[in-house]
């Protein structure tokens, strides 16, 4: 079964996809489906993207034969789910990859965003990586994913609504104002075009955001120099995590950009990246439990300024 079901209690869509139950879980290198010679990639490759074998959304989803019954609504789960394999090296990750390889990865993200946005049914393109079994990564081989949604996910609607409200009241993008107001205490790493910081409003311990200093709303607006610097910042932030905690530090990396084939919100929506780590120190997990899940009221046990200091003072080689 694969379909969308509407929740009238929260005004959001839920994706029902039984196919995701079949995904492999933490296979060894010899059984890895995305190593060279594996099930998905039998030929040599550098980096590659392909449609997920176990998708939540499909370009040609099965039809939904359903008549609306009271509050119960269903729709076809039309969309795209892609896997992005960063490298053929099973034993590396963003912190250890050559900078040139990450630059090529950024170009691939841009290309896939451009191509997927051409589909009329695509409303939102979400690029992400789950690193580590602590956040549910099913494959240890370095990879991420891209979901092209046929609707605006709820948190995206909330972000757009909040940024719109701020812009209407202040006549300024909220992230642009954050960039103008930030000092040194929450800074993690800075370049000419980007600032990586633990935000004043961090929800997770050691949460890091990456903000372009220039107001851009999607990856498609990045200049050549910005794309190169973006690759560098991604490498530095992830390397700082690994070195500070002396381990392959788990995280959820998420790219937030403006919607496509929807209302133009580019004047107030500022592209940004969020790293949400599931750990509150080297050996302890920060559980997203009842309060966070049920109310979206997050309790952060690590003071953002202290987390930023630790990450800022962790020196890494690029």
Swiss-Prot record:
Q: Which reaction does it catalyse?
A: alpha-D-galactose 1-phosphate + UDP-alpha-D-glucose = alpha-D-glucose 1-phosphate + UDP-alpha-D-galactose
| Note on how the cofactor is bound | Binds 1 zinc ion per subunit.
Annotated Pfam families: GalP_UDP_tr_C, GalP_UDP_transf
Report the SUPFAM superfamilies cross-referenced here: HIT-like
Q: Which domain of life is it from?
A: Bacteria
Kindly list the cofactors needed: Zn(2+)
Keyword Transport assigned: no
One MF annotation (Gene Ontology) recorded for this entry: UDP-glucose:hexose-1-phosphate uridylyltransferase activity
The record's active-site residues are 143
| UniProt GO BP | galactose catabolic process via UDP-galactose, Leloir pathway
Q: What is its EC number?
A: 2.7.7.12
Sites where the protein binds UDP-alpha-D-glucose: 130, 145
Q: Does the keyword Zinc apply?
A: yes
Where along the chain is Zn(2+) bound?
32, 35, 90, 141
The pathway entry for this protein reads as:
Carbohydrate metabolism; galactose metabolism
What's in the keyword line of the UniProt record? Carbohydrate metabolism, Galactose metabolism, Iron, Metal-binding, Nucleotidyltransferase, Transferase, Zinc
Can you name a GO cellular component term? cytoplasm
Q: Which family does it belong to?
A: Belongs to the galactose-1-phosphate uridylyltransferase type 1 family.
* PANTHER family, A to Z: GALACTOSE-1-PHOSPHATE URIDYLYLTRANSFERASE (PTHR11943:SF1)
This protein is called Galactose-1-phosphate uridylyltransferase
- Origin species, per record, is Thermotoga maritima (strain ATCC 43589 / DSM 3109 / JCM 10099 / NBRC 100826 / MSB8)
């Amino acid at each position: 079964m694969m379909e969308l079901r509407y929740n009238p209690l929260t005004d959001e869509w839920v994706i029902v996809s039984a196919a995701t139950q079949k995904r492999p879980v933490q296979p060894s290198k010899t059984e890895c489906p995305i190593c060279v010679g594996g099930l998905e990639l039998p030929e040599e490759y550098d980096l590659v993207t392909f449609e997920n074998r176990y998708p939540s959304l499909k370009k040609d989803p099965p039809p939904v034969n359903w008549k609306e019954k009271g509050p119960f609504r269903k729709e076809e789960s039309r969309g795209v789910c892609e896997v992005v394999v960063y490298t053929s090296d099973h034993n590396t990750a963003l912190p250890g990859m050559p900078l040139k390889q990450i630059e090529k990865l950024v170009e691939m993200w841009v290309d896939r965003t451009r191509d997927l946005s051409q589909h009329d049914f695509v409303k939102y393109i979400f690029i992400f990586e789950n690193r580590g079994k602590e956040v549910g990564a099913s494959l240890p081989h370095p990879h991420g994913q891209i979901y092209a949604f046929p609707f605006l996910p709820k948190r995206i609607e909330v972000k757009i609504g909040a940024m719109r409200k701020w812009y209407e009241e202040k006549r300024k993008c909220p992230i642009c104002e954050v960039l103008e107001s930030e000092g040194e205490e929450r800074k993690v790493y800075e370049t000419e075009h980007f600032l990586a910081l633990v935000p004043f409003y961090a929800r997770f311990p050691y949460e890091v955001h990456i903000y372009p200093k220039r107001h851009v709303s999607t990856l498609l607006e990045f200049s050549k120099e910005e794309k190169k610097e973006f690759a560098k910042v991604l490498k530095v932030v992830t390397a700082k995590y690994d070195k500070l905690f002396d381990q392959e530090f788990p995280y959820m990396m998420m790219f937030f950009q403006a919607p496509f084939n929807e209302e133009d919100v580019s004047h107030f929506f500022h592209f940004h990246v969020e790293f949400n780590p599931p750990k509150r120190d080297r050996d302890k997990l920060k559980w997203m439990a009842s309060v966070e899940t049920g109310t979206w009221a997050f309790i952060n046990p690590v003071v953002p300024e202290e987390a930023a200091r630790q990450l800022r003072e962790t020196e890494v080689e690029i």
